[in-house]
Structures are given as C-alpha cells and as structure tokens.
Amino acid sequence: KPIDGAFDELPVGRDPDLCIYFRGEGNAVMLGAFQARSKPWDVPVPDDFAFQLIGDDWEKFAEPLANGQWRIPALHSSGFERFVNGPESFTPDNNFLMGETPELRSLFVAAGFNSVGIASAGGAGRYLAEWIIGGHMPIDLWSVDVRRFGAYANNTAFLRERSAEILGLHYQMAWPNREFETARNIRLSPLHDRLAAQGASFGVKAGWERPNWFARDGMRAEMEYSFGRQNWFECHAAEHRAAREAVAVFDQTGFGKLELRGRDALAVLQRLCGNNIDVPVGHGVYT
C-alpha cells in the first residue's frame, strides 16, 4: 500500500544479513527475500505451466516480513495489497546449465539460471551460440556445462534438500572453499568410516564424500571459514610433508575412471599424458 515518500525511482536496497531486498513500486515499496532456507516446490509441474504464480504463503514469508518492517518501519502501518509467489529454477551447485546434452546430440540447453538470468543473458547467449555454431566450447565453460552432473543429481530427494539451501546462498558470505551443507552422504567410499575415524573433514565432489583434510592434535574436523588462512592450513602442510618425505595413501574412489581400448590405446595415451604409460600390466602410473 502507499507509503509517504515512496516512488518508482527509489534505489534498490539489499540487506544480506536479514536476507531481504526492496525497491520502489509506484508510491509503495516492494519487499522480497532470499531466505537462508527456501521452500522447495516439487509437486508435479503441469505441462502447460509457464510464467504462472502459485498461492500466497504468508506463513513462510513471516520472517522476511518482520525483517522488512524492522528495516523500513513504515511497513508496519502500510500493509501489502498483493503477494507475488512464483517458482524459480535453481541448480544443485548454484551454477546454470548450458551446452549439448550427453544423451541426445544437437540438443542444447540454457536453463537453471538461479535468479541471475537477466544479468547472465548476454554472455550466456553469446557463448552458447558460438558453441552451437563451432561444435565445441569457445572458452572453458565446464563450471556451467550440463554434463557436470551425474545420475545422483537427478534424484527428487536430493534435489528437494539441496534446492532449499541454494537460493539462500545469494545473500550468504561467499567464503573460499565453502562446502554445501545439505544432501550429503549420497555417495560414500568403502573406506569412509575409516577415513572419518582418522579425523577426515569431508567435502563433496560429484556427490562423493571426499576428505579435504585430516584434523590433528585434538582439533575438530570442521572447516572454520575465513578470507585469511583457514584452520586446515597446518593440517594440509603436514599431509604434504608426509607425501613428499615419507609415504601417503590416497583413496581415489571418488575420481572418475575412463577405460580406453583398442589397437592404438597406448599410442593415444602416450600422446595425451605427460608421463610414460608403457608399463607392464598390473602397474599404475601417476601422470
């Protein structure tokens, strides 16, 4: 409803601590939110659903509304004439989906833009067009390549849990090395329990729980986020020294495995790899 002094050209305001944003809307104020935990919409989507809204949800919006009224006291008395509630697409890692699908050649995707579609449209459109015309990525676009997800990410339970976290990351601190908190323990190594018993602090890569570092000297195996040197630094240094000066064992369960067969397999690998691959059967080569 109208608020004294409000007008269309009011600057957009954002309060990441309160997870809200607001701007002028005529002679009123529009209030929105990127809540830390959003509400997944996983009901069957009608085939003809496009640019439509769903029902009001004042209960879910109660916290952002209270935060908005604290930030803009005039909202206490003005009220709201309209509640706009519609679904938005978010991906499991907060990066959009682009490129040719692995299941069907010549089918290209540009979707899941995580509320930054307008801001990303120019660059995404250009590089996708060049990708289609040229037949390959014009630059390194692996972080948004649709092929980066495996079957584990096409699971409703996984998506429901992870999507609730992703939206809120827009207004959370972008810590270096931040790990997702939801939809964890999807894919575990046979050694997972033994690694955990040795103090492993796990991160997730392609759904696999993999040790990032091992806690030492009674410390907790939990990441303490910082823009400076983080709490794992000395632990990592000890592991590095052990690998250089003594011996280390690596669990490579979570790494991809490719099998190359055929008469020219060795020649191709010798060309691709930096190390000598021509070794007897049963040996391994680090390259």
Predicted regions and their residues:
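Central beta-strand plus flanking loop segment that forms part of the substrate or channel wall
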Residues: 1-7, 63, 256
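C-terminal catalytic lobe of FAD-dependent flavoproteins
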Residues: 17, 26, 47-188
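Glycine-rich phosphate/pyrophosphate-binding loop
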Residues: 32, 37-56
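Short, glycine-/Ser/Thr-/acidic-enriched flexible segments
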Residues: 3, 27, 36-37, 103, ...
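Conserved FAD-binding catalytic core of PHBH/FMO-like flavoproteins
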Residues: 2-37
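Short beta-strand-initiation
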Residues: 8, 15-17, 83-84, 93, ...
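Pocket-edge structural micro-motifs
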Residues: 24, 31-35, 82, 99-100, ...
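Glycine/proline-enriched, intrinsically flexible loops and inter-domain linkers
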Residues: 139-140, 144-287
